């Protein structure tokens, strides 16, 4: 996958949600799928609030990083 986040300069690639240089983060990746953008992420068992449900902070991070990546990519498309 050629993710938008792979093209972020090193000085801004440490985000906990999508930074490729943050080894402790989620490393969310977003890519084009036709005219839409897609992020696929499977929460780990330790990222749940109760069994079977992702915690709200993870969901917020997914939305934040996907939206930021999409906006940046759309600007250069």
What are these language model-derived features?
Residues 1-46:
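Non-catalytic linker/capping segments at the edges of enzyme domains
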């Amino acid at each position: 996958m050629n993710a938008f986040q792979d093209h972020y300069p090193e000085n801004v690639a440490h985000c906990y949600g999508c930074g490729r240089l943050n080894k402790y983060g989620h490393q969310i990746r977003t890519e084009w799928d036709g005219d839409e953008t897609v992020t696929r992420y499977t929460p780990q068992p330790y990222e749940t609030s109760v069994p079977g449900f992702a915690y709200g902070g993870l969901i917020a991070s997914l939305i934040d990083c996907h939206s930021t990546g999409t906006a940046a990519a759309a600007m250069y498309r």
